[in-house]
């Protein structure tokens, strides 16, 4: 759909279209940190991206939409267990979509969170080289970043939510 729109309209008009999504500010009820780790090693080639795109079904999109809405609600209400559950569930849906999304390095990025008060998953943006984390403890964020460094993963971004 987007390719057709881009061919027929200028970028400003394309951006103004209703894509069925919305961007809104999310006010979190709790003190969380958001971290992005970079493995420096894309796992997905152009061919793999096309394969993943062809695997995306309406069922997958509906499941992910439900997860996102549940996550949004959990963050607004400060429900840590639901936040963790939804991040994990989203990561599992990405794995089911295409196991190759999780490179060995991305698996390490997620496994580094073990025994910490954090949750992690692939960013899901398509390159297979970044993971995102929600941390519920500044101390655990520091421990996680050190674990990442020890396996060559770089902290790309960190902010408080």
Task: Enumerate the predicted regions with their spans.
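C-terminal nucleotide
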Residues: 1-125, 132-161
């Amino acid at each position: 759909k987007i390719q057709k729109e881009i061919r027929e309209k200028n970028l400003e008009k394309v951006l103004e279209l209703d894509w069925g999504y919305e961007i809104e500010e999310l006010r979190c009820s709790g003190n969380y940190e958001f971290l992005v780790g970079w493995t420096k090693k894309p796992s997905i080639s152009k061919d793999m991206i096309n394969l993943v795109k062809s695997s995306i079904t309406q069922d997958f999109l509906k499941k992910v939409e439900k997860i996102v809405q549940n996550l949004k609600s959990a963050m607004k209400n400060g429900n840590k267990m639901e936040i963790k559950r939804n991040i994990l569930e989203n990561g599992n849906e990405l794995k089911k979509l295409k196991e190759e999304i999780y490179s060995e390095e991305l698996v390490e990025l997620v496994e580094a969170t073990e025994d910490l008060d954090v949750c992690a998953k692939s960013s899901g943006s398509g390159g297979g080289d970044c993971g995102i984390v929600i941390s519920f403890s500044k101390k655990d964020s520091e421990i996680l970043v050190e674990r990442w460094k020890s396996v060559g993963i770089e902290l790309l971004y960190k902010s408080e939510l």
